[in-house]
Amino acid sequence: MGIVEEAHNVKILGSGEQTVVLAHGFGTDQSVWKHLVPHLVDDYKVVIFDNMGAGTTNPDYFDFERYSTLEGYAYDVIAILEEFQVGSCIYVGHSVSAMIGVIASIARPDLFTKLVTVSASPRYLNDMDYYGGFEQEDLDQLYEAMRSNYKAWCSGFAPLVIGGDMDSVAIQEFSRTLFNMRPDIALSVLQMIFQSDLRHLLPHVSVPCHIIQSMKDLAVPVVVSEYLHQNLGGGSIVEVMSTEGHLPQLSSPDVVIPVLLRHIHHDIAI
C-alpha cells in the first residue's frame, strides 16, 4: 500500500470503464457517500477517500502549513488520481471538496471529464456585490465557540447544518464524524474554508460543471449556485433540489441520489 493510499484510506470499488471520484466535505469522511456508492459500482469504477484532517485519518499526517489553503487538498486529489492511474474522472465534490475540485481541474484539466458539485460556495462571506450568507462577526463567534468547548459546539452545529428533525439519523451521523476530528485541526480547517475566496478562479475552469444544491441550506444561499453558473469558465448547469440542509446526500438520499445519478450519467446538452 502506497503512502497516498494509506494516508487517505483510498478505496477503489466497481469495475466500469469510467471512473467516478467521490470527495467529502468538512466534518465528514467517505462514509457520507454510503447511499450513493451502491448505485454506481455496477457501471463505474468508484474512488472514495478521506480528506486529510478527517477523523478517520492519522492526525500526525496533518500539515497545518500545507492545509492552510485549499491548494494543498487539490494536490492531494491529483496525487490520488495519479497513484491509481486514473486517466480522466467524473469528480463529485461536496461542499469544500467542490472547490478543491475546481482548483485541481484548473491545474490538471486532463484529469477531469466533468465536475458535479453539491452544496458548493466560492466564498462564504458577504462582500460589496456578493451575498455569501455570512458576516465576519458571525464567523468569529463560531470560531470562539469551537475553541471554548468543541464537543458542545459539535452538538449545536450539526443540527443547524443538516436541518430537519433533531433526532434524525443524519444529524447523529454528522455529529459522530464531526466529533471524530481533532479539535485544533477542525478549527484550522473550518477557518481556512470560511475565510477563503475563490471567485477569481471560476473563469479559469474549463471542464463542464453540474451545480446541485438544496433549496434551503444554512451555509450556501441559492444565489451562490447562480453566481457559480454565471462565472464558471466552462459550460455549467444548476439544479436546486426541494431538500433542506448542507448534506442532502445524507439527510435526503431518496431525493438526492436520483439527481446525482442523472448528472453523473448525462452530460450537459450543448
Swiss-Prot record:
EC number(s) reported in the record: 3.1.-.-
This entry carries the following GO cellular component terms, namely: cytoplasm; nucleus
Fetch the Gene3D superfamilies from UniProt: alpha/beta hydrolase (3.40.50.1820)
Q: In which tissues is it expressed?
A: Expressed in stigma.
Q: Which residues pair up as cystines?
A: none
Active site feature:
95, 217, 246
**Keyword line:** Cytoplasm, Hydrolase, Nucleus
Which GO molecular-function terms appear in the entry? Answer: hydrolase activity
Q: Where in the cell is it found?
A: Nucleus; Cytoplasm
Query: Could you tell me which InterPro entries the record lists for this protein?
Result: AB_hydrolase_1, AB_hydrolase_fold
Which Pfam families does this entry report, sorted A to Z? Answer: Abhydrolase_6
Asked if the keyword Transport belongs to this entry, the reply reads no
Q: Which domain of life is it from?
A: Eukaryota
What does the similarity note say? Belongs to the AB hydrolase superfamily.
What PANTHER family does this protein map onto?
ESTERASE-RELATED (PTHR43039)
What the protein does comes down to: Hydrolase which may be involved in plant olfaction during volatile communication.
- From the Swiss-Prot or TrEMBL record, give the protein name: Karrikin insensitive 2 receptor CA
Q: Which organism is it from?
A: Petunia hybrida
Gene encoding the protein: KAI2CA
